[in-house]
């Protein structure tokens, strides 16, 4: 297995005035992961993650007793997963008659298990593109014996997803027909095979939150 990870961070702070400051941070991350999922060499998954994260905070002193804080965050996570099979060969290249359960082209996928011998597994192609937005505002007010806070939080979540899980078949050979799993493999007599249709999903969600809080200091011993 192999992992390459690259990260970069930029941070900035700026004061517009004695009562207004802003700070921001940008994070860029790229991760390439070669995952060996079975126990035969040459079969693995190439997984690529790319992440952008942006955060900004604006703090405004409205008066000696009142402060407003606004926070914005944005997070973008892209995941691309590709299967790697020696020679880019599927079972159909060896004379089988399986039909892929998706349209278009994709790298060859292999998930073949021979009980007691090996598990040739390369994972399956997929893409996950996620975006998350968050807007938060908090107003803090110190008024005599009361410390008041009012806030709102708005979140937006976006996901674009495509998965070709078992578009090429999962095939398992046991000792069902000949009493020997390897012999069943040579004769092309599987114990089990499974295929699943292509999955598309594009959910979009909103989340809204509000809060109000009063810390009341009744006396020195009671709040």
What does each of the following model-derived ranges do?
Residues 1-223:
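Short acidic-glycine motifs
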């Amino acid at each position: 297995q192999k992992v390459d990870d690259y990260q970069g961070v930029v941070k900035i702070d700026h004061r517009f005035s004695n009562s207004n400051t802003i700070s921001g941070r940008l994070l860029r991350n790229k991760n390439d992961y070669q995952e060996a999922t079975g126990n035969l060499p040459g079969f693995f998954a190439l997984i690529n993650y790319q992440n952008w994260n942006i955060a900004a905070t604006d703090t405004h002193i409205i008066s000696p007793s009142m402060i407003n804080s606004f926070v914005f965050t944005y997070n973008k996570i892209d995941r691309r997963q590709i299967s790697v099979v020696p020679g880019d060969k599927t079972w159909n290249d060896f004379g089988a008659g399986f039909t892929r359960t998706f349209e278009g082209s994709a790298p060859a996928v292999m998930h073949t298990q021979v009980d007691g011998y090996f598990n040739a597994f390369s994972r399956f192609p997929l893409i996950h593109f996620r975006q998350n937005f968050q807007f938060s505002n908090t107003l803090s007010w110190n008024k005599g014996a009361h410390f008041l806070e009012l806030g709102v939080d708005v979140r937006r979540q976006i996901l674009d997803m495509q998965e070709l899980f078992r578009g090429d078949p999962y095939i398992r050979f046991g000792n069902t027909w000949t009493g020997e799993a390897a012999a069943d493999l040579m004769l092309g007599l599987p114990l089990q095979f499974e295929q699943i249709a292509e999955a598309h999903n594009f959910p979009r969600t909103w989340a809204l939150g509000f809060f109000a809080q009063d810390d009341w200091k009744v006396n020195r011993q009671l709040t």
